[in-house]
Structures are given as C-alpha cells and as structure tokens.
Amino acid sequence: MIDRFGRPLEDLRITLTHVCNFECFFCHMEGEEGDNYILSKEDILLVAKVAKNFGINSVKLTGGEPTLRRDLVEIVRGLKQLGYRDVSMTTNGFLLKDLAYKLKLAGLDRINVSLHAISRETFKKITGVDAFDRVIEGIKSAIDVGLVPVKLNFVVNRRNREEVFKFIELSQNLGVNEIHLIELHPVGLGKLAFKEHDDLREIEEYIEKISIKKQIRKKHFRPRYVLPSGLIVEVVKPYANPIFCAGCNRIRLSVDGKLKTCLYREDNVIDILDILKGEYSEDVKEELLGRAFMIAIAIREPNFKYKI
Ligand code: SAM
Ligand code: SF4
C-alpha cells in the first residue's frame, strides 16, 4: 500500500513491552506513553496477520526491552509462520547470550544490539547498569548462532561522542556486519537529553572520507558507508530531516494497542484496542483491523516536510 505522499508501507515495528532492565538517559520509549494494557501474543499475531495482507513483509520487535517478554520466542515463531520474510529485533543485549540460539531456531532473521560505549565506565554512564562485558558476550553469541547481519546501534551524544572511532574499531574486531550511528531524537526522555545531542555532521564527513563506497538505503534514504574492512556504517539522522521522512516505510504497533503512524506524533494514531478486546469472531476482528489499517495509511504523513 502506498500512502498519499507516495510512500510504500513495508515494515511493522512492534513494541512488546515498556519494561526495561536498563535506564538509558535518552530513552525515547518508541514515542509511547501509558501502558495500562499489554497486548497478548495472540493480539500481536492477529495484527501482524492483517498487516501482512497489506503487503507488509518485515517486522522489527522492540520495547522497552523485548527479551524481557517470556513469550518472545513464541512471538518470533508465530511471525515466521505467518510468512514474514524478515523478522528482526532490537535489544540491549543483556539477556542475549542465553537467548540467541533459541531465537535463531524460532526463525529470527537478524538482530540489532544497542551498544553505546566502548568501556564499562561510559556504558554505565549511559545505561545506568554495569553490563558492558555481558552485552559483548551477547553480541558474540548472536554472531556465533548466525543472527546475521548483526548490527550495533550507537546513539551519539556528549557522553560517548569521543568514542565513535574506537567504537568502529571495536565493531570491526568483534566481527559485526554493520553499525548504526544514530542521532539522539527529542522524544520521551530524549526531550530532556537533547542538550547532549550531536548532529553527526563532522562524524559523517570523516566517515565518508575513510570509506570506499557510499550507498543510499531505500528505507529513510539513509546514507551507508562501506569501510575498507567491509564494515558498513549507516548514519541515521531523522531530526528535522524531510528526506528521512520521505523514505519512511514504517507503521508501529504500540504495546497498548495503537497503530502509531510516526515516532514523533502522538496525535496520528488509531486505537485498535477495542477491536482486539471485543467479543467478535476472528474473521470480524480481521475485517475491522483491516479498516483500521486503511485509516492509518490514509492519515500517515511525513513529520518533517519541505515547505513550499
Ligand atoms: N531496549 C532495546 C534497545 O535498547 O535496543 C529496544 C528498545 S530501544 C527504545 C530501540 C532503539 O532506540 C535502541 O537502539 C535505542 O538505543 C534507541 N533509542 C532510544 N532512545 C533514543 C533516542 N532518544 N534517540 C535515538 N535513539 C534512541
Ligand atoms: Fe531500555 Fe532500550 Fe530504553 Fe535503554 S533504550 S532504557 S535499553 S528500552
């Protein structure tokens, strides 16, 4: 399905929980508030089934910390059984060492692990937890079991900015395939943390110079740089960036049952909780959810647009 701004809808981002075992000072919580209701595995799979009918073929699981959901492995298995081509997850990696193999067996295709530091000290300053070594173990397990490509997310801010180039080195040594250098978004706690924002301009200029190839990804038109080692560095700069929004192919399912059309917008949402909780047959629920998707696609609009 294409929205009225010509953007295809291809990707469903599902928040599985708001609970987290870390306290990152900038956490945007996927732009969600309130979690009086937590969608069940059945709710999630039903919405995913309907999304699939709209041509959506890739799912990203997120949170909170998705590995804290006890039914995570079953959710992944259910998504693959629905026929999703690409099922991936973003995690803080704390529980990954023991989960990686189970997730791989359930069909998880690939993984993003957030690692915002190259040392125990900075890691703790950012996440509030002394877990750097443990997350590194998790990353190694993901590589070992073949959850590839393994990508690392690094949200750049004043506490870790000086570590970016060492982070690239560390990633190369670990053997990960790709890293994402992400601009801090002013959403959730990110609003307060925005004073520590870095626009990534200088960092990107330097990376471009040392790279051997530049590519532009279809999703968000994100620039990617291939380094001589083969490591891919993707630069994620959404803030006040109309080009990024023009390439947005994503819709979000919030943990409390809303179709959220944009990370930044709290108004552009369709509440589907009544449908999910309603005493309807599954066929009727599917029909109603389909209509909700149609409305969500109709109201979807880029948050940052060029002014004419
Ligand atoms: N707990 C998991 C994790 O940290 O990877 C998944 C949820 S987290 C909200 C999803 C991604 O958003 C992570 O890579 C995290 O670093 C990133 N993130 C969180 N707050 C952010 C912010 N204010 N700006 C940019 N990225 C942010
Ligand atoms: Fe937890 Fe992820 Fe938010 Fe950090 S960014 S507090 S790990 S949900």
UniProtKB/Swiss-Prot annotation:
SUPFAM superfamilies: Radical SAM enzymes (SSF102114). Pathway: Cofactor biosynthesis; molybdopterin biosynthesis. Keywords: 4Fe-4S, GTP-binding, Iron, Iron-sulfur, Lyase, Metal-binding, Molybdenum cofactor biosynthesis, Nucleotide-binding, S-adenosyl-L-methionine. Signal peptide: none annotated. InterPro entries: Aldolase_TIM, Elp3/MiaA/NifB-like_rSAM, MoaA_arc, MoaA_twitch, MoCo_biosynth_MoaA/MoaC, rSAM. S-adenosyl-L-methionine binds at G64, S114. Disulfide bonds: none annotated. Binds 2 [4Fe-4S] clusters. Binds 1 [4Fe-4S] cluster coordinated with 3 cysteines and an exchangeable S-adenosyl-L-methionine and 1 [4Fe-4S] cluster coordinated with 3 cysteines and the GTP-derived substrate. Catalyzes the cyclization of GTP to (8S)-3',8-cyclo-7,8-dihydroguanosine 5'-triphosphate. This is Probable GTP 3',8-cyclase.
